[in-house]
């Protein structure tokens, strides 16, 4: 059978996420769409910059819960999906759920979908997608609440992400380049991946109180080498865990890390050291932790490291001062370079005390919730020295970029992050490169919703060629 030549627009090579002909989509709205990828090349004829349509739907995330997906149509279709967290900060923008316990246990997002299709979509028709800040401001005005509770942050974010992709497509540049230009970032930098290889806390069914035990290949010379190092340590760790705890202990948590049934957090760190050494990367791979301490903070100001077992005898309850001493012991005994959320989101004094006594990176997640106001307060109180950037905590691309810029201006590090409930959407990979954040965490080198981000970073590095890897300078790339 003779081969026919594909139309020129289907031959082009694109890196960033999916799009199809917008006109064809509007005419027939087929259930199965042929995609081409937005970003790397652009035709001689300028692409249409105006919104012609917006369509939202309910899809399912990696934990089996509903989430929002948004198609935005110009000449092409740009699709984005919204993540969701398990351990969420009380100051995050509101994730709108339906609350009907008879449908998806109350976790449906049909109201958020309705808000997009009936309230947001009509307002965006004819809007120029290259003006990200203007589009986001329009949605914030339409919502009119401090925490995006009218439309839902998950509704607003889905549209905002698709607008950003459409802006890149309209300009004929990769998504990461569009983000670089939008944010005013001088140099593109490949981030150090923080692989979450042991899961605890709210992400796993074991007894570990602390949520994430991560490895950071700071000694690599490229992202691809860093990924190889992380993958090899991950598989080495699996062998160690299988030998020590049995096959069942090799089951993975929400983010692809192993969840061995150990309670002693120090034991988790020893497992990492053993795997790093056995894989041959001692000195080249450092350790990071996400404690997620708000999950086990008690009303009396203490912290229960056995919070998963209720009731318990209180033997593992520590004061904030004792918990800080435990962190300092960990830092002394292990090559730890980063600790996230070591204390509760409102325990400002404990944050500041630890910050003044250690020289590692202290990352604010629940403390900051990617909110410029919380960031400003933390800068004033000298509570931490790095931002965990989660786009769904704040709800728009514009505010996410501003949070990163404010943090960098204060001399902080910026770690772009996924959520435990993820999709195949890989926006944050381009975001990390475009902002030159220097570091990203998006789970273990396992589970497709995690690898979609890492694989996108491999593609970006391949396309950019001689691009700098943040390495040891991940805090200030």
Swiss-Prot record:
Family: Belongs to the enolase family.
Binding of Mg(2+), residues: 290, 340, 365
Cofactor binding, per record: Mg(2+) is required for catalysis and for stabilizing the dimer.
pH dependence: Optimum pH is 7.5-8.5 for the forward reaction (PEP formation) and 6.0-7.5 for the reverse reaction (2-PGA formation).
Gene3D superfamilies attached to this UniProt entry: Enolase-like C-terminal domain, Enolase-like, N-terminal domain
Compartments, as annotated in UniProt: Plastid, Chloroplast
Cited PROSITE patterns: ENOLASE
Disruption phenotype: Distorted trichomes and reduced numbers of root hairs.
One GO BP: glycolytic process
Transit peptide extent on chain: 1-41
Record-linked SUPFAM superfamilies: Enolase C-terminal domain-like, Enolase N-terminal domain-like
GO terms of molecular function: magnesium ion binding; phosphopyruvate hydratase activity
HAMAP family for this protein: Enolase
Modification type Phosphoserine: residues: 476
Reactions that this protein is recorded to catalyse: (2R)-2-phosphoglycerate = phosphoenolpyruvate + H2O
Name of encoding gene: ENO1
Active site per database record: 255, 390
Keyword tRNA-binding found: no
Protein keywords: Chloroplast, Glycolysis, Lyase, Magnesium, Metal-binding, Phosphoprotein, Plastid, Transit peptide
Protein known as: Enolase 1, chloroplastic
Pathway assigned to this chain's UniProt record: Carbohydrate degradation; glycolysis; pyruvate from D-glyceraldehyde 3-phosphate: step 4/5
Domain of life: Eukaryota
Cofactor(s) recorded in Swiss-Prot or TrEMBL: Mg(2+)
UniProt entry tagged with the keyword Plastid: yes
Stored InterPro entries: Enolase (IPR000941), Enolase-like_C_sf (IPR036849), Enolase-like_N (IPR029017), Enolase_C (IPR020810), Enolase_CS (IPR020809), Enolase_N (IPR020811)
Main location: plastid
Enzyme Commission code(s) on record: 4.2.1.11
């Amino acid at each position: 059978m003779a081969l026919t030549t594909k139309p020129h627009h289907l031959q082009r090579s694109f890196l960033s996420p999916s799009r199809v002909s917008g006109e064809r989509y509007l005419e027939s709205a087929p259930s199965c769409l042929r995609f081409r990828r937005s970003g790397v090349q652009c035709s001689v004829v300028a692409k249409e910059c105006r919104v012609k349509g917006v369509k939202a739907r309910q899809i399912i995330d990696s934990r089996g819960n509903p989430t929002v997906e948004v198609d935005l149509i110009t000449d092409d279709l740009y699709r984005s999906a919204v993540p969701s967290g398990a351990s969420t900060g009380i100051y995050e923008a509101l994730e709108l759920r339906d609350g009907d316990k008879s449908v998806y246990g109350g976790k449906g997002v049909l109201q958020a979908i309705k808000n997009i299709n009936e309230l947001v979509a009509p307002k965006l028709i004819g809007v120029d997608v290259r003006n990200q800040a203007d589009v986001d401001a329009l949605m914030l005005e339409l919502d009119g609440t401090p925490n995006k509770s009218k439309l839902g942050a998950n509704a607003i974010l889905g549209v905002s992400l698709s607008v950003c992709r459409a802006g890149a497509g309209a300009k004929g540049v990769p998504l990461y380049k569009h983000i670089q230009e939008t944010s005013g970032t001088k140099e593109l930098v490949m981030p150090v991946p923080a692989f979450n290889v042991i899961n605890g806390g709210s992400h796993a069914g074991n007894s570990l109180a602390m949520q994430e035990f991560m490895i950071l290949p700071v000694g690599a010379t490229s992202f691809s080498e860093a990924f190889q190092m992380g993958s090899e340590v991950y598989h080495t760790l699996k062998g160690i865990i299988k030998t020590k705890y049995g096959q069942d202990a090799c089951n993975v948590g929400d983010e692809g890390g192993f969840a061995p049934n150990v309670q002693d957090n120090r034991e988790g760190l020893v497992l990492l050291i053993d795997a790093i050494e056995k894989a041959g990367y001692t000195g080249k791979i450092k350790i990071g932790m996400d404690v997620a301490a708000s999950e086990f903070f008690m009303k009396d100001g203490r912290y229960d490291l056995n919070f998963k077992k209720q009731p318990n005898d209180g033997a593992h309850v520590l004061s904030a001062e004792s918990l800080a001493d435990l962190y300092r012991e960990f830092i002394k005994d292990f090559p730890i370079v980063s600790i996230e959320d070591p204390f509760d989101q409102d325990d400002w004094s404990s944050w500041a005390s630890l910050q003044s006594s250690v020289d590692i990176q202290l990352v604010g997640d629940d403390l900051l919730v990617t909110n410029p106001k919380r960031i400003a307060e933390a800068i004033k109180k000298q509570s931490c020295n790095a931002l965990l950037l989660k786009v769904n905590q704040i709800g728009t691309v514009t505010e996410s970029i501003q949070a990163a810029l404010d943090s960098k201006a204060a001399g902080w590090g910026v770690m772009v992050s996924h959520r435990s409930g993820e999709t195949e959407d890989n926006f944050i990979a381009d975001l990390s490169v475009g902002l030159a954040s220097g570091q990203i965490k998006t789970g273990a080198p396992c589970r497709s919703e995690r690898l979609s981000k890492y694989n996108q970073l491999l593609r970006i590095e391949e396309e950019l060629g001689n691009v700098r890897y943040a390495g040891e300078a991940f805090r200030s790339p």
